[in-house]
Amino acid sequence: NFAGLYLNTNKERMEVKGYTLKKDSADPYVTALLNSGKHKMKAHEILSGRTALYTNIGFNSPVTFVKELHNKQLYDSYQSSRKKIEGLFGISLEENFLSWMSGEFAITQSEPGLLGHDPELILAIRAKSIKDARKNMEFIEKKIKRRTPVKIKTANYKDFEINYVEMKGFFRLFFGKLFDKFEKPYYTYVDDYVVFSNKAASLLSFVEDYEQKNLLKNNPGFENALSYLKSSSTIFLYT
């Protein structure tokens, strides 16, 4: 194991740059990420100004990421679940779910908004085309509703459509523990992103911040930190 780091510090900031060799025993999801390229970060343009913790994960494409899961046990488990889901609902996970994703995933934890008392979790997935994303999500909803008793609900808040699909472990099927906190997601569409959360109130607070321009991109501290970094990344963490 080896790591080489360069440390630079002054009164205003501390900067660490360098390289490290990946362990052979590294988590298979980390290995898959490192082998799947990177993606331009833009999610901060829609994220709430209340964001306390922000992780941006980027790769060339979700399809590439899944194919990079060389861990046989994980990949076999994915393939088994995939066949069951596709057979049960009559959908293609690759064509109807993974294909519209551009490769940028933003996970945030925010301070409680006006409509709740608990920290809010948000997952924002950037779409290649939001029109295509909406079309495929509606197709998946239609198939699920036709073939199962799974609850599907839709409500409108201002000009935003809030959707809910009661399917536990939906994200874990595709991306394992990366998104295991989002079990039965509510979701809506904001700009080029499909935005998910475990609670409807979290999405409503998110929409309020977006409408009021209370955005992370306008935070001076975040803006300053981002100015020192490249616009494309595999893993980015801000707190």
Positions of PLM-derived features:
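Generic amphipathic alpha-helical segments used as scaffolds and interaction surfaces in large
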Residues: 38, 42, 53, 72, ...
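Leucine-rich, highly hydrophobic segment in Treponema pallidum outer-membrane-associated proteins
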Residues: 1-69, 104, 177-186, 199, ...
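Single conserved position on a long alpha-helix in the C-terminal lobe of the eukaryotic protein kinase
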Residues: 55, 95-225
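Surface-exposed polar/charged interaction patches
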Residues: 36, 72-75, 88-91, 95, ...
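Predominantly extracellular/luminal regions of secreted and cell-surface proteins
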Residues: 50-90, 145
